[in-house]
Amino acid sequence: MPVTKTVKMLVAEAKEQTNSISPADAHDRQHSGDAILIDIRDIRELQRDGRIEGAFHAPRGMLEFWADPDSPYHKEIFATESELVLFCASSWRSALAAKTLQDMGFSNIRDMDGGFTAWKTASLPITKDD
């Protein structure tokens, strides 16, 4: 069966329908208390590449379940009025995730442009597991 909509097309649509934020602005908003950073990367990526201090890890496969207040897996961090800034390695998965949370009714969602890779390129602080 031929693919009629590629992942690039899905990501492009998601990016058109969601708000984004630069890594520098995400850093500033996190440190001013106006935003919570949500890291949706796989745990192996965090272990290999490091993490953003203070970011909440919500694996992409659990995101909807953790965000839904009616789910038995709900995490209270998603019941906030603060802005939630999602990121992955390059902002493809996080764009799709931001679109999904918007579809669920969240209005306080942003996708971090370029993801963790752009954060590191901007020389913003990261921590590494020992």
Predicted regions and their residues:
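Short, surface-exposed ligand- or partner-binding patches at beta-edge/loop junctions that are enriched
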Residues: 87
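Active-site flanking residues adjacent to catalytic metal/cofactor-binding acidic residues
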Residues: 38
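Rhodanese-like catalytic fold shared by cysteine-dependent sulfurtransferases
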Residues: 1-35, 43-83, 92-130
